[in-house]
C-alpha cells in the first residue's frame, strides 16, 4: 500500500561550513528516502538552516556583516555541499523566514492563551567585559549532573542532560575568558511538566529506539522542569510579541521550522496540502532523523509543543550517534573537523555514503572514521567485489555477442537466491539497519564472484561449441550485478547512474525478480576507480580543517 511520508533532518546551524559529521545524518536519511521512493511511496524530504541565535550575531559582527547577509552566504555554502553529496531535499529552507515567524508567533499565542507560558525574573550569566548575556554555547563549565568539565551551558555531551547555564559549575565566558556575573532578567517559561503523562505514553508507543526510551525514563525520574523559551537582547532572531528586548530561544523556533519549511514547500507544489501532513490526526507519516545530542529537545519539548498547538507528532524518530576520528567527536565549534568540501576535493560522495551505510544501524553508536579502514572497505567491497563482477564478464558480451544478453539464465537457483534475499535487505533498509543490508550485499557479491571463478568463462572462448554456455554464464553474472546495484542504488547514486548507463536500463526495485534477457548493453567502461593512499592523507591527524 502506497504511503504518504514526510522526512526531516535536524537543521545545521548557520554559523559555518558543514563537516563530515553533519553528513552522517543527511546521508542516513537520504538513503532511507531514496529506498522508500524506489518502493513506490510518496516521500517528501525537507531540511533548513537553523539561522538564529547569539553565535550568528557575534560571528556576523566579527566579519562586519549584517546577520542576514551572513546567513545568506552560509545558506548557499550549505546547499552547495549538500548537492555535491547527492542529498536530494525537496526543500532546503531557513528558519529566518516569514513562514517561520508566522508559525512561531501563532504557536506562542496558542500556548499563552492556554496558560502554558509563565514569566518570572531569573538570573542569567552576563559577560561584564563584553556587555552581553551569554548564550548557552558561549559559556563552559562542569556539568551540574555528572560534573564532567568543559561542557556547554545547555547540554552535557557526556551524560546527555539538559540544564540552565547558571547551573554550570565554575562557568567561564568563551568571549572574554572571564567568570561571568549573574544578572536579573524577565524570562518566559513553557510548562513542560504539564505534559509528563502524555510524554510517558508517547515515548512508550514505539516512536523511539529502546535505548532512548531508557534514557528518557532517567529524565522522567529526575523530574521535568519548565523550559525557558526566551533570550535577551542583543540577539538575532524573532521578537516575542510586545517585548522589543526579548527574543524567542532558537530551540523553540528551530523545530517549528519543520512546519514552516513544509509550508513553504506546499506553496511550490500545487498538489501538496499542508494539513494532510500536519493536522492532529493525519494519516500521513512523519519520520525525523536526529543526533543523540538533541534527543531531549526532540523527545520532550518538541512533542509537547505539537500537542499543545494541535499539530501531529512524529511517527518515528531515528536517533544516531556521532562521528569520531581518532576517538574524538567532530565538532565545528571546537574546530576539529573535516569539512565536507575538503572531502569532495580529495574523494567522491559515494565513498562516504557507502562507508557510513556499512556502519549505520538502529543502535545509537558512534561511528569511527579510520582512513586505512575506509580505503580498504571501498577498494575491497565496492571495486573488487561489486564493480569487478561486471568487468569480469562484460567484455565477453561486448566482443562475442554484439553487446546483447542471452535468452536464458545459466543458474536459475542462484538467481532465485538473489531475488529471495531482497526481502531481508528490504527489512534492514526499512529499519535503518544499513550495516546488515550492506553485509548481505557483500556476502552475495562474494557468491557471485565464486560462481565466475568456478565457471571460468575465459576458458570457454577457446571452443565455439561453448558459445551458448558462455553467453548464458555472462548473462547470469550481469543479472546478479544488476540486482546488487539495485539494492545499492539508494546508497551510491553515482555508481548506480553509471551502472544504468552500462546496462542500458533504469534500476527498479520492482524489476529485481524479472531477468534481463535478450537485451542490449553498452560497451563497458570503468564504473569507478580504486582509492589511492595519497587521496586519504587529509583524513590523517594534523590535516583537519
Curated annotation (Swiss-Prot):
Cofactor(s) this protein cannot do without: Zn(2+)
MF terms (GO), sorted A to Z: ATP binding; metal ion binding; methionine-tRNA ligase activity
Gene name per UniProt: metG
Class of this enzyme: ligase
Location, primary (coarse class): cytoplasm
EC number of the protein: 6.1.1.10
Protein name: Methionine--tRNA ligase
Keyword Transmembrane attached: no
Residues engaged in binding Zn(2+): 143, 146, 156, 159
